[in-house]
UniProtKB/Swiss-Prot annotation:
Pathway: Carbohydrate metabolism; D-tagatose 6-phosphate degradation; D-glyceraldehyde 3-phosphate and glycerone phosphate from D-tagatose 6-phosphate: step 2/2
Cofactor, free-text remark: Binds 1 zinc ion per subunit.
Species of origin: Escherichia coli (strain K12)
Stated name of the protein: D-tagatose-1,6-bisphosphate aldolase subunit KbaY
Top-rank EC class of the record's enzyme: lyase
CDD domains given in the database record: FTBP_aldolase_II (cd00453)
Length: 286
């Protein structure tokens, strides 16, 4: 088994009406927890790392871990560069073996976003690396990125069509009412906008900010064409909450093998639920 491009996973998902979950990773324990569940449920998976993650643990170390687990669990997986903003950074990481990258130029005007994305696409496609980009802008906070509500805006369907045609991007993250982080109230998802985007864009669509979104809402977006669902905040909250509870019950505890496993097990329940919501279980052979 090996680290593969997300395009192979997303093409199958698009053809068969399900979504591939993309779980953000932060260390060896989060990688292990996610893959334990994906192996058990035989679900394809995308492991997503932000620039902040690769500051915490080197890409080369994460890549080695993922390669080893891919062999151990006999399953292909994609290691994905999430919310990267620099061609130079992406180039270095692709040369290190990564075959999936998101270039985030959503903070730029349309023309500048197109120019940046096209430069990344030209390089990545020469390396058999798939490229995701974002049009429209999600609000909220994730990792080192913060976007206030005034700066967020939804994806225009006709602009999305032009954007894909001009850049040759492999998948498109759309802004339809979700946000990074948790919600103070139930989000208002613009399903009609998503349907209109799907009508004019044929590449796989990506839902960012899926943490804390009601399961039925996520399922509806998949019915309307979403083939990659990003989850980050819910994983961290589950892990941290379980570890905090363990220390509350074991104030003298100090063995990482115990409290890390408690956090991992809590995270695994979130992963299990998201796989069920995405409909991705039993999509890879045993």
């Amino acid at each position: 088994m090996s680290i593969i491009s997300t395009k192979y996973l997303l093409q199958d998902a698009q053809a068969n009406g399900y979504a591939v979950p993309a779980f953000n990773i932060h260390n060896a324990e989060t990688i292990q927890a996610i893959l334990e569940v994906c192996s058990e449920m035989r679900s394809p998976v995308i492991l997503a790392g932000t620039p902040g993650t690769f500051k915490h643990i080197a890409l080369e170390e994460i890549y080695a871990l993922c390669s080893a687990y891919s062999t151990t669990y006999n399953m292909p997986l994609a290691l994905h560069l999430d919310h990267h903003e620099s061609l130079d950074d992406i180039r270095r990481k692709v040369h290190a073996g990564v075959r999936s990258a998101m270039i985030d130029g959503s903070h730029f005007p349309f023309a500048e976003n197109v120019k940046l994305v096209k430069s990344v696409v030209d390089f990545c496609h020469s390396q058999d690396c798939s490229v995701e980009a974002e049009l429209g802008r999600l609000g909220g906070v994730e990792d080192d990125m913060s976007v206030d509500a005034e700066s967020a805006f939804l994806t225009d369907p006709q602009e999305a069509k032009r954007f894909v045609e001009l850049t040759g991007v492999d998948s498109l993250a759309v802004a339809i009412g979700t946000a990074h982080g948790l919600y103070s109230k139930t989000p208002k998802i613009d399903f009609q906008r998503l349907a209109e985007i799907r009508e004019v864009v044929d590449v796989p669509l990506v839902l960012h900010g899926a943490s804390d979104v009601p399961d039925e809402f996520v399922r509806r977006t998949i019915e309307l064409g979403v083939t990659k669902v990003n989850v980050a905040t819910e994983l961290k909250i589950a892990f941290a909450g379980a570890v905090k509870a363990w220390f509350a019950e074991n104030p003298q505890g100090n063995d990482p093998r115990y409290y890390m496993r408690v956090g991992m097990d809590a995270m695994k329940e979130v992963v299990r639920n998201k796989i069920n919501v995405c409909g991705s279980a039993n999509r890879i052979s045993a």
